[in-house]
């Protein structure tokens, strides 16, 4: 199946968990992103608020481990949170500070 799974989101880094490492030595940083915006749905304005868990791997994990409270623009894809949970987690592939 060739379905797209692409996410682009501007959000606040609400919480940063301690960095950890895989057995292969890859840095893993779990964060919580908080997003608020007005969207148009069915011709009406709709206020959207959400928090979503997200994960950053590798060099970017090291760079963002002390950036709680920063607004960012992220791009990535949705995946299951763990082998035992089908709850979604945003897997971040690109992250940069949001300048508005």
From Swiss-Prot:
Key words of the record: DNA replication, DNA-binding, Primosome
**Domain named SSB: residues:** 1-99
Domain of life of the organism in this record? Bacteria
UniProt entry tagged with the keyword Methyltransferase: no
Entry annotated with the keyword DNA-binding:
yes
Q: A Pfam family in this protein?
A: SSB_1
Subunit: Homodimer. Interacts with PriA and DnaT. Component of the replication restart primosome. Primosome assembly occurs via a 'hand-off' mechanism. PriA binds to replication forks, subsequently PriB then DnaT bind; DnaT then displaces ssDNA to generate the helicase loading substrate.
HAMAP family recorded for this chain? PriB
Question: What task does this protein carry out?
Answer: Involved in the restart of stalled replication forks, which reloads the replicative helicase on sites other than the origin of replication; the PriA-PriB pathway is the major replication restart pathway. During primosome assembly it facilitates complex formation between PriA and DnaT on DNA; stabilizes PriA on DNA. Stimulates the DNA unwinding activity of PriA helicase.
Q: What is this protein called?
A: Replication restart protein PriB
Organism of origin: Neisseria meningitidis serogroup C (strain 053442)
């Amino acid at each position: 199946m060739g379905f797209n799974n692409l996410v682009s989101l501007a959000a606040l880094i609400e919480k940063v968990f301690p960095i950890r490492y895989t057995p292969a030595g890859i840095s893993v940083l779990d964060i919580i992103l908080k997003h608020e915006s007005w969207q148009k749905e069915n011709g009406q304005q709709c206020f959207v608020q959400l928090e979503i868990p997200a994960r950053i791997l590798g060099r970017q994990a090291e760079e963002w481990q002390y950036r709680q409270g920063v607004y960012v623009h992220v791009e990535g894809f949705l995946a299951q949170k763990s082998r035992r949970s089908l709850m979604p987690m945003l897997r971040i592939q690109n992250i940069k500070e949001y300048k508005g």
